[in-house]
């Protein structure tokens, strides 16, 4: 099977337009996540390589945030070494990244990535929150702030763009949804191109 390109996926979306409104599919479809967890992703854009399949088998995304993280970790070379840390965090719950969970708002900012700093937007939100803390709160959490800001500075060049990878994940998810739920239509399209 020939690998899917972005233009092919857009053509697939047009191909199924009479059957389903791809813009309104649920993002919690169990059949789709089962397909992704099995790495049955031939014909699913950005998830067809052996490397991507390996990462899917390891992470086994159960929701959209985990799929976004999986794609960000797989497709950002500077983030890929962190995939094993992410796996440990994902599997060992509750996980407390050193000092990151001491400040409630920081914990909330990182909840979509299981408490791990993955995205530039998370770093920006953390910096913003720290800048709005009272002097008393800054003194109370001084050590946590020091460790958090040091970690952000250390990882600055490796962090991914959350909005970019969320958009990519949505594109991949919709492609996988069609394969999982409209299998005959999917293969009809695949064989016709």
What residue spans do the PLM features occupy?
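Mg2+-dependent phosphoryl-transfer active-site scaffold
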Residues: 1-160, 165-193
